[in-house]
Amino acid sequence: MKIRTRRVALVLPFLALLGCSKGADKAGAPKLTIGFSLDTLKEERWQRDRDLFVAECEKRGARVLVQSANNDATLQNSQVENLLTQGVNVLVVVANNAKTAATIVETAHKSGVPVVAYDRLILDSDLDVYVSFDAVRVGEQQADYLVKRRPSGNYVLIGGSPIDNNAHLVRDGQMNVLKPYVDKGDIKIVSEQWAKDWQPVEALKIMENALTRNRNDVAAVVASNDGTAGGAIQALAEQKLTGKVLVSGQDAELGACQRVVAGAQTMTVYKPIHLLAAKAAEIAITLGSKQPLPAAPRTLNNGKREVPAFLIDPIQVDKDNLAATVIKDGWQKLEDVYKDVPKEQWPQ
């Protein structure tokens, strides 16, 4: 009897540990599990999204399983299937391909799992909700900043990935601003290309070709994000045109912020990711808990339905307000952004 009693005493704590390992909360109920499927983690921006989103979910008592597809739509579909087999309650997706990701929504719904499109709209699907920044407004802010400073001349447009719906929305916003100037003949668009996977090396090639064809006569480059801006600026530097040609960007990445204060990049569009991550976490937990979704301020048609959309306003940033926005928010550190600038020139 003594031996049997001792065995029971040893087994009971072990069983308690097993219960904890399954992610039970203090009351013994299992935690809500969120699957977060990202297209890529190559860019600084997406690493920040991952970390902030996970932190926001954990703060609310949920756990997050993260997968990154390395810019591969087929791999992303496979990873989503894996997340579903692990029993996630809700799926949050940064889609590689806006159209083929419809399969992800269909597969998730067959398992009774709702889907949140994070930052990138998923087309032609019964998507549950979309949480993002206003991508059209991003493009408008980029073009607006440049045309106010160069209302005439040759313009180069470098878009993002052609299979990313956001890239097209940004381009729509750019053209909302540029078209009246083009129609009047003040601005001539001499190159209008897309950079595969938003890659800087693709932007470099596009910019090199544009400079060659136009004998370096370029007034401005409407680059759709900071990565493509960096590629374009590399091509400009090779022709000793750094700072002479206006260049836009998006994301307020560290390298871009350094280029802005140095005068190589004219502006960037800052998107407060902490607001996006918090809203996405709130929506995901609401859906995963089978609670009613709060009323969305607007809807967006994805080709199949009007999708409830929660869109956050971006912020136009240049060297004059960078410290009051990007640095004040803690997105970048003052000493990192200004590391190549004499300290007496740092903002006070």
What are the residue ranges of the model-derived segments?
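A residue-level marker of the well-folded mature domains of exported/periplasmic proteins
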Residues: 20-348
